[in-house]
Amino acid sequence: MSKFYDIDLPFGIKYEGTLSELLTADTNKLIEVKTERDKWKETGNIFVEFVWRGTLSGITTTKADWWATILTLEGEIQGIILLPTNIMKAKVKKLINEGIASYPVKGGDDNASEGALVPIKELMNYEG
């Protein structure tokens, strides 16, 4: 057991409660949920939508407090990327500006969306 158990426990309980509230909808926070099918496993990228059929959409217009991307493989959830929307927006913008994320890219159903291909590894490791 950590010698800082008495300090770590309240800290852990606080954030355990935050996640529990988000997952049980026992909060006034909104979560935007997107799902990536199998292709992410091959490419290592997720698609972040900015425009749909010529109209601003997705991360550009969301009012959600949290942005969730569910990663599925053969119909089974493999993981979930969950970030505060403001942090997701900032990270994606920086990755685009630095040429790490590809933008603009067509995607989504019928390639009706325009957005960014964002490398998952860089998204999760990126500081800034």
Task: Locate predicted features.
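Hydrophobic side chains in beta-strands
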Residues: 33, 69-70
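Non-catalytic C-terminal interaction segments of nucleic acid-processing enzymes
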Residues: 1-7, 25, 54-55, 72-128
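Short, surface-exposed beta-edge/turn micro-motifs
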Residues: 28, 56, 63-67, 77-78
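Conserved catalytic cores of phosphodiester-cleaving nucleases, focusing on short active-site segments
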Residues: 22-39
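Mg2+/Mn2+-dependent nuclease catalytic core
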Residues: 37-61
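Short, flexible, glycine/charge-rich loop motifs used to bind or transfer phosphoryl groups or to couple energy/partner
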Residues: 19-22, 56-58
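Nuclease catalytic cores
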Residues: 4, 8-20
